[in-house]
């Protein structure tokens, strides 16, 4: 779920800070983050960090939460967000491209509601040419990443299901094109609908990522257990993909995940991530019993303890 920076601040407090060292190979980076009601400041090696940069440039994180199940169950927006998040962790040029596309779509939709203004058609055409340039790049990157995820997630799921189930991810692009010019032509062909409904009806903001088991949509026909296995294997595929592309291992965060999993899925997850630095949050230590080596810290009222207080 989405949270604001201010939500991290303890009740009855007006600010919070995070101070730590990131080690990557032989290199160390000192990171200090200070968040208050009014501002957020980040320092890396005592130098103020550009807020427009993604902190994931410093190191990769993959988060597992119980809410991940909604990626399967909910609408296509969450599936697009997952793919965009994965691409961003691999390609830091992607975020500004997507941000510019979203801004252009917002402005175009605003223009579509004012069709009587002078030079309307010249303006809408200029928007379409700009949108096509960014949309085609997003389309290419999504298509490439989904193919890799499909391959890796299939392998994990096939193994977990003892060969009984075949997991698939398919990119159902709303507009398919072989060039930005072809993308523009398809937007042009759809313009009549856009004028009628006063909103942009076609584009990468309408893309769908279909997730299937044995060629059936898991959203509609999968059991709760199958859906849970599928999203775990997709996230494992994300971890593997990041390692393959960057050569670096992600830090794994489990946010109260094991309370939702049976022993088989928990063991499978831990087996595949045993060589990764992993941080687990839980409301009790029972879910940590199957972990061979771990350091446990207890948190109560915002304070951290080595032993149960």
Please report, for each region that a protein language model flagged, where it lies by residue.
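A structural micro-motif
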Residues: 16, 59, 165-167, 276, ...
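Structural recognition of the conserved hydrophobic beta-strand(s) that form the central parallel beta-sheet
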Residues: 20, 277-284
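Walker B catalytic acidic pair
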Residues: 255-257
């Amino acid at each position: 779920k989405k949270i604001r920076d201010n939500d991290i601040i303890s009740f009855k407090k007006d600010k919070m800070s995070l101070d730590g060292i990131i080690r990557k190979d032989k290199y160390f980076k000192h990171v200090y983050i200070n968040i208050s009601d009014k501002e957020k400041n980040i320092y890396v090696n005592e130098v103020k960090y550009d807020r427009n940069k993604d902190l994931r440039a410093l190191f990769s994180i993959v988060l597992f939460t119980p809410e991940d199940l909604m990626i399967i169950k909910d609408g296509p927006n969450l599936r697009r967000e997952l793919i965009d998040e994965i691409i961003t962790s691999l390609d830091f040029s992607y975020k500004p491209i997507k941000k510019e596309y979203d801004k252009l779509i917002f402005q175009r939709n605003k223009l579509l509601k004012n069709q009587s203004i002078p030079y309307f058609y010249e303006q809408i055409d200029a928007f379409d040419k700009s949108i096509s340039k960014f949309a085609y790049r997003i389309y290419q990157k999504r298509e490439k990443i989904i193919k890799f995820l499909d391959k890796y997630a299939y392998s994990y799921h096939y193994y977990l299901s003892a060969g009984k189930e075949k997991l698939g991810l398919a990119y159902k692009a709303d507009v398919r094109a072989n060039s930005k010019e072809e993308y523009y032509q398809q937007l042009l062909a759809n313009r009549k609908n856009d004028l009628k409904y006063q909103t942009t009806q076609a584009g990468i903001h309408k893309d769908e990522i279909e997730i299937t088991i044995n060629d059936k949509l898991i959203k509609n026909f999968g059991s709760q257990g199958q859906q849970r296995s599928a999203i775990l294997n997709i996230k494992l595929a994300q971890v593997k993909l990041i390692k393959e592309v960057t050569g670096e291992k992600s830090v794994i965060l489990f946010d109260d995940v094991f309370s939702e999993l049976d022993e088989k899925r928990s063991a499978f997850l831990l087996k595949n991530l045993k060589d990764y630095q992993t941080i687990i949050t839980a409301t009790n230590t029972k879910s940590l019993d199957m972990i061979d080596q771990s350091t446990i810290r207890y948190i109560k009222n915002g304070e951290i303890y080595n032993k149960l207080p």
